[in-house]
A protein has these predicted regions:
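Bacterial Sec-dependent N-terminal signal peptides
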Residues: 1-23, 630, 653-656, 660-666
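Generic signature of intrinsically disordered, low-complexity, basic-rich segments
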Residues: 5-6, 15-19, 41-50, 369, ...
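A generic structural signal for short coil/turn motifs at secondary-structure boundaries
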Residues: 12-13, 125, 157-161, 415-417, ...
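Membrane-proximal, glycine/serine-rich, low-complexity loop/turn segments characteristic
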Residues: 19-228, 237-251, 264, 429-439, ...
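Exposed, low-structure sequence patches enriched in small/polar residues
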Residues: 113, 224-290, 302-666
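Short coil/linker segments at helix-helix boundaries
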Residues: 213-214, 292-303
Length: 666
């Protein structure tokens, strides 16, 4: 580790010295890559804004409302259906999505000067501190080559017993952009561990005198998750030369600016041949020191302790040919065809059984009932199964132009375990002037047939086992968005509808089930930001309706942020405000600790409680230094104590937080 830190420091020093010698202006370009085609999606660059710094964390960045165990590091699920993303093809990764950096989430950069950021945030609670450290660095080692690294470390003890979580994640990335040959490569990692407490034994303790950390909890377990990914995207473009007139300015002998022009030769790609290689390994482990005292329903393998694990290794190779949009000046669109092969290794614990001990699932009774007697092998055996899938697909797109852009893509699995799986996606957006401002309109749709995750079909652990024959899930989604930002009001409305056929969910007993029919979900997402020179009010309102109790959603989810902002003494940017999060009552699913899945329940509703934070945010311009202080959930001290993430799991009580972020660039 010391050697790695030394290499990073040396590389940073070399790049900063080179930038200082050349005295060039700071220009930065950033992009991410599409998961199927590897095509770059250009971004604006590093976000150096000081606004809303206290609210930025892994969970809030994922969705405006999430179910968790109330700790910053926790298995989680968005309460907003259309925010839920499956980024890794591994069932047990779903609950850790906010903490995963996939190759498609890695940002690549081209910078004229090196850029780095260091951030530290801390929650102050006696012996239950919360710490977050972020570091990022990127810089060009030559005109065409860029290298960078990001590192995030989070450690949060949680406010209740047996709730501590830790995660260490980051990425190392590099890119080369030549006239004909280019490549992007990355290695990303995530290691996460969190203790499981099953919620409070008695929720009435919230109304008593016990401190949160002294309230009895229902179990003692631990979960660990690891994700590693390597990625290489490289391509060669056949180009034609094109002359372009370039206007520029330079000083004459007397120091006056004069306008000049010249002819620049640029390379326009005609056809691009691309190869993408990706390998990732995801694994999940669940441990209990005493299986007999677990709140989980059965014991299949070891009556004294639980040590379950499952993993999925995925290797992908993609070959693609692109007919570039830049060269197609007649029809003004680009096209791509590709073939992708995916090889997966599924490894899980399998064993033989002896005592099947039934415990009341998620109940308060720990009385064991022997329901069956079978033979037990005390050791854990491991079963390995390889699967292979081959896809063909294509895209048609128009990214250039001022007014209308579109993209259509699709693929189908022709061979392998996922035979017959397919997806068709499309989007169109248009922008035009309306009065003094610009309006944008967009529409999206997809139709997908999805093969159930391997571990939804086959799984064996100390508490659960199943062999299912689920059918493919069909999903049809259509949606539209309209935005019309003006000087004082910035409204944006998104309406989305989805029909899900053969939806798979986890039932109250922790077993996966498939709905024999269709479920409809409708959501209206309205954002209205009111701005004045000094006071802003940001509003985010989401309405959701689900036609089935097997897909529970809150009807309304709200986020409001009222704040004052100004510049003091022409040197200090200031933001002072209060924000609130709220969702209406509903039958929230409850976390199953052994599976890391959220199971439906119809016993208790949670919601109708606002979580309010007050904060102050500062930016010292001359130092490029951001500072903040926040009193989180301050209303917990004077409102009723019926605040729950899900049944049995209270929200975190009030806490004081502070932090800083420092940017370094020439």
């Amino acid at each position: 580790m010391r050697c790695v830190c030394g290499c990073i420091a040396a590389l940073c020093n070399i790049m900063f010295v080179q930038a200082a010698e050349k005295a060039v202006p700071t220009v930065m370009r950033a992009w991410q890559l599409d998961s199927w085609t590897g095509v770059a999606d250009t971004l604006s660059g590093i976000d150096s804004s000081y606004m809303h710094l206290p609210m930025r964390n892994r969970l809030n960045d994922y969705s405006i409302s999430n179910i968790s165990n109330s700790n910053l590091i926790s298995p989680s699920q968005s309460r907003i259906y259309f925010d839920r993303q499956k980024t890794v093809d591994f069932l047990f990764a779903d609950a850790y999505t906010p903490y995963i950096i996939t190759p498609q989430q890695v940002k690549y950069y081209h910078t004229t000067t090196p850029y780095s950021t260091v951030a530290y945030k801390k929650g102050f609670v006696s012996n239950l501190d919360q710490n977050e450290i972020n570091f990022s660095f990127t810089g060009n080692v030559s005109r065409r080559t860029n290298l960078g690294i990001t590192i995030d470390y989070l450690n949060s003890y949680g406010r209740f017993a047996n709730q501590e979580g830790k995660t260490f994640l980051g990425s190392v990335f590099g890119s080369y952009n030549g006239d004909h040959y280019s490549l992007q490569s990355s290695f990303s990692w995530n290691t996460l561990s969190n203790f499981e407490n099953g919620g409070l034994q008695n929720v009435a303790d919230l109304q008593g005198v016990l401190k949160p950390e002294d309230m009895p909890v229902r179990m003692q377990g631990m979960s660990a998750f690891r994700y590693l990914a390597g990625y290489l995207n490289h391509y060669y473009s056949i180009c034609v030369e094109r002359e372009r007139k370039v206007n520029y300015r330079e000083r004459d002998e007397e120091g006056n600016w004069i306008k000049k022009d010249s002819i620049k030769i640029e390379y326009v790609p005609v056809t691009t041949f691309r190869h993408i290689f990706e390998v990732n390994d995801a694994s999940k482990r669940y441990v209990e020191k005493s299986a007999k005292q677990s709140i989980l329903p059965n014991i299949y393998r070891n009556p004294t302790a639980t040590n379950d694990s499952a993993s999925c290794l995925t290797i992908k190779n993609t070959l693609a040919v692109t007919f570039e949009e830049e060269f197609n000046t007649l029809l003004h669109f680009g096209a791509m065809v590709y073939v992708m092969n995916e090889c997966q290794r599924h490894t899980s614990a399998i064993g033989q059984t002896e005592n099947i001990i039934h415990l009341e699932p998620f109940g308060n009774s720990y009385n064991n009932v022997i329901s069956n007697t079978l033979h037990l092998m005390p050791d854990t055996l491991y079963g390995v199964r390889w699967t292979n899938n081959t896809y063909v697909g294509g895209t048609l797109y128009k990214h250039r132009g001022e007014h209308i852009h579109y993209g259509f893509d699709g693929n189908v699995c022709l061979l392998g375990y996922k035979l017959g799986e397919f997806q068709v996606n499309g989007h169109v957006d248009a922008g035009f002037r309306l009065g003094k401002d610009s309006m944008t309109i967009a529409a999206k749709a997809f139709f997908r047939s999805e093969t159930p995750d391997y571990y939804l079909q086959h799984y064996l652990s100390n508490h659960y086992r199943w062999n299912n024959d689920f059918q493919k899930t069909l999903r049809l989604r259509v949606g539209g968005e309209i935005a019309y930002p003006t000087q004082w009001v910035k409204p944006k409305l998104n309406i989305t509808f989805e029909n899900v056929t053969k939806h798979i969910y986890f039932d109250t007993d922790g077993m996966p089930k498939q709905v024999d029919g269709s479920i409809q979900v409708l959501a209206a997402d309205l954002q209205v930001n009111l701005t004045t020179p000094w006071v802003n009010l940001d509003n985010h309102i989401i309405y959701q309706h689900s036609s089935s109790e097997y897909l529970p959603l809150p009807t309304l989810t709200l986020y409001h942020n009222l704040y004052y902002h100004d510049c003091w003494f022409k040197a200090l940017d200031v933001q002072i405000g209060v924000d609130m999060r709220f969702f209406t009552k509903y039958y929230a699913p409850i976390l199953n600790p052994a599976l890391g899945q959220f199971c439906v329940q119809d016993i208790e509703q949670v919601g109708n409680y606002p979580v309010m934070n007050v904060y102050a945010n500062f930016y010292v311009k001359s130092l490029r230094l951001k500072l903040f202080a926040q009193y989180q959930h301050f209303n917990a001290s004077f409102m009723n104590k019926r605040y729950f993430e899900m049944p049995g799991y209270p929200m975190a009580p009030d806490m004081f937080r502070a932090g800083l972020a420092w940017h370094f660039y020439k």
